Amino acid sequence: MTQLLTKTEIQEQAKVLSGWTVEESKLHITRTFKDFIQAIEFVNKLVEPAESAGHHPDIKISYNKVKITLTTHDAGGLTQADFDVAQTISQIK
């Protein structure tokens, strides 16, 4: 099983993730796009990195907004994998 990060580790890693928040042992970000098509194009760009990492975000699409949530379900909270995927997602335009 993957090791959970400590509260201190979570706080330190969250500092370098612009736009992400930590709530209830989950990382969240909401990205807003011009329209639905751009939102879907962004979501499609998440597929390859998530598959490569073997770590998949929860995604909610509402017209031009995409809410992404990361947590390691089998570990019951945040792990390094969540922050690694968040860093990758942050680089996708």
Swiss-Prot record:
Keyword Iron-sulfur attached: no
Keywords from the named record: Lyase
Keyword Thylakoid annotated: no
Catalytically driven reaction(s): (4aS,6R)-4a-hydroxy-L-erythro-5,6,7,8-tetrahydrobiopterin = (6R)-L-erythro-6,7-dihydrobiopterin + H2O
GO biological process: tetrahydrobiopterin biosynthetic process
Record InterPro entries: PCD_sf, Pterin_deHydtase
Record GO terms (molecular function): 4-alpha-hydroxytetrahydrobiopterin dehydratase activity
Entry's family note: Belongs to the pterin-4-alpha-carbinolamine dehydratase family.
Official protein name in the record: Putative pterin-4-alpha-carbinolamine dehydratase
Record organism: Nostoc punctiforme (strain ATCC 29133 / PCC 73102)
